[in-house]
Amino acid sequence: VEEGEAPDWQCLVERREDYRIGSVPAGGLLLVGGADVQKDRIEASVWAFGRGKESWLVEHRVLMGDTARDTVWNSLAEMRAESWTHASGAALPLARFALDTGFATQEAYTFVRACRDPRVMAVKGVARGAALIGTPTAIDVSQGGKKLRRGIKVFSAAGGIAKLEFY
């Protein structure tokens, strides 16, 4: 898949399955979440992954609100803390959560830092990269006028490689 190319819609239609949104299909072994920050909202998705790179969209939410204010970030924190019901009846939490830091960067860093959870990662999209998820870059951010001794790490995420992997 070339950069800027969309996958063949017919291939995607042929891959569809019938399952209830918000539940994890039987083949789903682990859940990952990701969120994209915009000025007036955060769009968050939860995906289940199974054997052979099989994946299912479990849920997609649009959390409306000014991303310069705490309310929408609190909604994202609540979503991140949830678990989803597997077809077996088991409750599955997120194994990993990635937050795009390309917009509202400082607010996104603050969110990741406040989670105090190594499963939550800051990511920055790049057009090209050697790997889907690159080596993390340590950042040192000032917050409230104080220099942080240990900044969070930001991982690069290569969109072109993601298309090759998943389509």
Go through the PLM ranges and name each one.
Residues 1-8, 23, 52-167:
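Mg2+-dependent endonuclease catalytic cores in nucleic-acid-processing enzymes, primarily RNase H-like
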Residues 1-33, 45:
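A contiguous, basic/glycine-rich beta-loop/short-helix subdomain that forms a polymer-engagement track
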Residues 30-33, 40-42, 90-95:
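Structural beta-strand/beta-sheet cores of well-ordered domains, especially the beta-sheet scaffolds
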Residues 33-58:
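Acidic, metal-ligating active-site segments
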